[in-house]
Structure formats: structure tokens, C-alpha cells
Amino acid sequence: MTTIVSVRRNNKVVIAGDGQVSLGNTVMKGNARKVRRLYNNQVLAGFAGGTADAFTLFERFESKLQMHQGHLTKAAVELAKDWRSDRALRKLEALLAVADETASLIITGNGDVVQPENDLIAIGSGGAYAQAAATALLENTDLDAREIAEKALNIAGDICVFTNHHHTVEELESTVELPKPTA
């Protein structure tokens, strides 16, 4: 599988992922690009799961973004509806992490759309390790979103055999002032 992590801090959002593609217990490729920019570079997306399945979902999600003029939540909900109702899509095994300048979402294979706590997303085989690392870094450091995502991926790559240290990182800067999280 893989590890994808998304962190939002100080008006920046990052989605980062490793590059490992595995077939069973064999590494087939180490430099796959599992994080992309979509919709005129205004949306970031990363996938964990089957590569062919993820490309299908990227295409579907991008068409939903076009249909809804880049509105992230509407596009995600419409994709999730299709994912639930379309027999071919229901067989796809992948998770998507998506973000724009105002929201971060997880779109799951069973058609759920989840807005994570603290705008932190970590999915894939190393997701739990990356989430733990990113949470600790968010709570105890002043590192920026990119540094946190990269460090979390490195920690996941040290622990998870299906995650490597070849990273793709995409970053958006928000022009919208977001409310500060409350304790």
C-alpha cells in the first residue's frame, strides 16, 4: 500500500505521499506519484490503495470538481454517491485524501466523506504511524505544515514496510482566513 498525510497549519495545507508500489511482498516501483494537483492547481489529492483504482477515482473526482466549479465538499459528496451506487466503482479499493484552501476531506471506498479532526489526514498502510507523529509535532512544535508532513512520512517509512522515503509533496497557501481551532 502506501502512506498519504495531509497537514494544515498557518494558512497552508500540504498533502504528501511516499512512492512505493508493492505487489504482495515485492516492491515493484519506488517513485510512484500518488499526490496530484487537480482543478487548475486549486485542489490537492492523494491516494492509498490500488493504483489503477486510484487513477479511476482521480478522473471521476476531477470531473465532479469541474461539474461543481471546484467546490470540494460538493464534488466529494457526489463522488461518494457514485461510489456507493455504481457497481464498477464499488469494487475499487482506494482511499482519497483531498484538500483545498479551506477544507480537508477523506473519501472512503464505502462512500463516506469524512472531515478529519484538526485537519490532519493520514491514510494507507503507514497512516496510523504518520498520524501519531504528525499529531505530536502539531501539538509540540512550531514546524510548518510541510515540515510536519515530511517528518511524519519519514517516521512512517521507518516503521511500515509498505512505505518508502521517496516523497511527493504538494502545498497550497490559503488566501482565506480560517478560524482558529478551539481547545
From Swiss-Prot:
Enzyme class: hydrolase
Primary localization: cytoplasm
Catalytic machinery residues: 2
Presence of the UniProt keyword Nucleotide-binding in the record: no
EC numbers, comma separated: 3.4.25.2
Annotated binding of Na(+), by residue: 157, 160, 163
GO MF assignments: metal ion binding; threonine-type endopeptidase activity
Keywords, in A-Z order: Allosteric enzyme, Cytoplasm, Hydrolase, Metal-binding, Protease, Sodium, Threonine protease
Regulation: Allosterically activated by HslU binding.
Compartments in which it is found: Cytoplasm
HAMAP family linked to this entry: HslV
Role played: Protease subunit of a proteasome-like degradation complex believed to be a general protein degrading machinery.
Protein name, UniProt field: ATP-dependent protease subunit HslV
Source species of the chain: Vibrio campbellii (strain ATCC BAA-1116)
